[in-house]
Amino acid sequence: RLGMATGNNDVYLRLWQEVSIRKVGLGFDSRDAALASGKKWFPYNKGGKFRRWYGNNEFVVNWENDGQLLRNTLHPSGERIWAHNFNLDYIFKPCLTFTATSSSYFGIRYSEKGFLFDNKGSSYFSNAEKLKPILGLLASKPATAILKAINPTVEFQPGNISIIPFFEEL
């Protein structure tokens, strides 16, 4: 899934160390639970440098009141909502996340429940028990070779990932 575009990262995103940990919501598995927590900042997968297996958990996003500000702030033109592509049915679920732009290697990582995700940190969703075996497959050299054959550029899109063949049991 392609992730959210905030429209203005300077307003909506912070590094972890820039906010009070008391205002950060960790480990929530649903929008309702996050809303009920009263927290303002939530973990945000935004891509980042090449890293395989786990990591690049550097940012938090302002998702206070179920993202009310993000979901309702108009673009300066006044013609549309500034942020878009919220994927509300998928946020806070465990997933595999990958950086859209890469030097040459495909870096895919496991992400626990509780994260929202960015358009530069797109995510792959499946049954939670299957995520780690799928991670093993997608982080392999054969998967990288297939991805390079499908898309020889440095941009990895969700559609590229979805056509990698694997056993139905996964």
Task: Specify the residue positions occupied by each region the protein language model found.
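Polybasic, glycine- and aromatic-enriched phosphate-binding surface used to engage nucleic acids
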Residues: R1-E169
